[in-house]
């Protein structure tokens, strides 16, 4: 993937950039692997906003991604196409299996049309192959990692992300997360070899607010420009700083958003690198 920069023909185009989509081999997705999506605008069943800054955006169809890959062990698959997915930052690869099945997976770095991938304990260590952590050598970069055996990939799924397998001890494997956190995961959990592709996506300059609206993201308003009834930082005569430490609209201090008593915290060996305001 490469990034194409626009000429500054308008204020919105100045500095803006877009992917050149050279890796994409097909623009029409596989119809059998698509489902309709109904937008909720960040509202719950009662119509109240539960997630701010969401709403609108271009209509999308959801692509069914195989995050488990446990029912095609031992069956080789050919990469038929690399496709764009509007629901995620990574590209996706359409696999044609020898038994006739078709599946979508996340497209790792280096995977191209015509390559052959496989899954299972005896799969080779090459990008796109999926196998249990116990069968992957230490030092390998992996992505789409399960947190529980058979639970489907949960970790390292966005464009350019990867996890390093540091080693294995007894029934657990030690993983270095993209954040720097070191976490233990059951060796029966599966992972895909390689890094997630489309890494240059992080360098795209969206250029104007309208492009973010196309993505379904609404404006984020600062608390200090609101009224006191709307935010703890609101009000005051003239331009103010809020007059207190940063808090959420509901008065909770900024940072420390992780659940403190999460059951899986006991498997964290070393916390992620954090700033002072996020330190525990």
From Swiss-Prot:
Residues 213-280 are annotated as: Disordered. It comes from the Bacteria. Pfam families: Ribosomal_L2, Ribosomal_L2_C. One of its GO terms (biological process) is cytoplasmic translation. GO terms for cellular component: large ribosomal subunit. Keywords: Ribonucleoprotein, Ribosomal protein, RNA-binding, rRNA-binding. Residues 268-280 have a biased composition (Basic residues). The keyword RNA-binding applies. GO terms for molecular function: rRNA binding; structural constituent of ribosome; transferase activity. NCBIfam families: rplB_bact. One of the primary rRNA binding proteins. Required for association of the 30S and 50S subunits to form the 70S ribosome, for tRNA binding and peptide bond formation. It has been suggested to have peptidyltransferase activity; this is somewhat controversial. Makes several contacts with the 16S rRNA in the 70S ribosome. Part of the 50S ribosomal subunit. Forms a bridge to the 30S subunit in the 70S ribosome. Belongs to the universal ribosomal protein uL2 family. PANTHER family: LARGE RIBOSOMAL SUBUNIT PROTEIN UL2M (PTHR13691:SF5), RIBOSOMAL PROTEIN L2 (PTHR13691). This is Large ribosomal subunit protein uL2. It comes from Mycobacterium leprae (strain TN).
